[in-house]
A protein has these predicted regions:
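Conserved G1/Walker A P-loop phosphate-binding module
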Residues: 2-99
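A short helix->loop->beta-strand "cap" motif at the edges of active sites that frequently abuts
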Residues: 155-159, 203
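Canonical P-loop GTPase G-domain recognition
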Residues: 169-229
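Flexible beta-alpha connector loops of hexameric P-loop NTPases
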Residues: 105-113, 176-182
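Conserved nucleotide-binding/hydrolysis micro-motifs of P-loop NTPases
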Residues: 105-107, 137-139, 165-169, 211-214
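Structural beta-sheet core signal
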Residues: 50, 132, 161-163
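Inter-motif core of Ras-like GTPase G domains
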Residues: 112-138, 150-155
Length: 229
């Protein structure tokens, strides 16, 4: 699978948004990243893979976390056919990188899942975190559960289940984008339900909204925790 780098920055850009990330380079020194050939030089990449169905907000989640519209987004069709990344150098020599990687939509059908997963099986093995994106207003997890059982079970310790579109949780309001107490209660129940259904610790299930920039700090913090276990 082709990997296209859409943007490249220094980690300072990201740690300005999430100050706890300034400790990440030191935390990752005890780990070897994925070897990547970049512009006739070899680097170590510490990849965060964003996985989920098309249209559930993988690309917009990366845009929201990084603060850059680096990934093409669409509510009605799949934009990602190959792997696209936003990269952050972890040292002045630019030999180590933190990589936010947007992968093609999966959990669509068994045939397409097998095709895509075969292409990036090596990426799953070497990545440092998998962000599996769901939606707060979805109820059918049949394909997602099948995918977890068949392909993702070995990586559970590195997975964050990210429930996007928290602002769509009932009861919705047109008067404010802030979550109401009732919405938060329903989202907490959603977290508990998803945790039980997928047999994942509740701390690894986070609700947020990429569009409204809700709870992004909690999502990024859990990604950090999964990368540094």
């Amino acid at each position: 699978m082709q990997i296209t780098i859409t943007r490249e920055y220094h980690l300072d850009k990201l740690s300005a948004r999430f100050p706890f990330l300034e400790y990440l380079p030191e935390e990752l020194r005890r780990h070897s990243g994925r070897i990547f050939n970049r512009d006739e030089r070899t680097t170590e990449d510490y990849q965060i893979l964003f996985i989920g169905k098309s249209g559930y907000g993988k690309s917009s989640t990366i845009n929201a976390l990084t603060g850059h519209n680096a990934m093409q987004t669409s509510d009605i069709e799949a934009c990602t056919k190959d792997a696209f990344t936003v990269e952050y150098s972890l040292n002045a020599q630019k030999t180590r990188y933190l990589s936010f990687c947007d992968l093609p939509g999966i959990a669509e059908s068994e045939k397409t899942d097998n095709e895509y997963l075969a292409l990036y099986e090596n990426m799953l093995y070497h990545c440092f975190c998998i962000v599996y994106v769901l939606r707060a207003d979805m109820r059918d997890y049949t394909r997602d559960l099948a995918l977890f059982r068949e392909k993702l079970s070995p990586y559970r310790a590195r997975i964050v289940i990210a429930i996007n579109c928290a602002d769509k949780a009932e009861p919705t309001s047109r008067e404010s984008t802030d979550l109401t107490g009732e919405q938060i209660d329903n989202l907490e129940r959603k977290r508990s339900s998803v945790s039980q259904i997928f047999h994942m610790p509740k701390e690894q299930v986070i609700y947020y909204s990429a569009r409204e920039r809700i709870n992004l700090d909690a999502l990024m913090h859990q990604i950090y925790n999964r990368m540094t276990i």
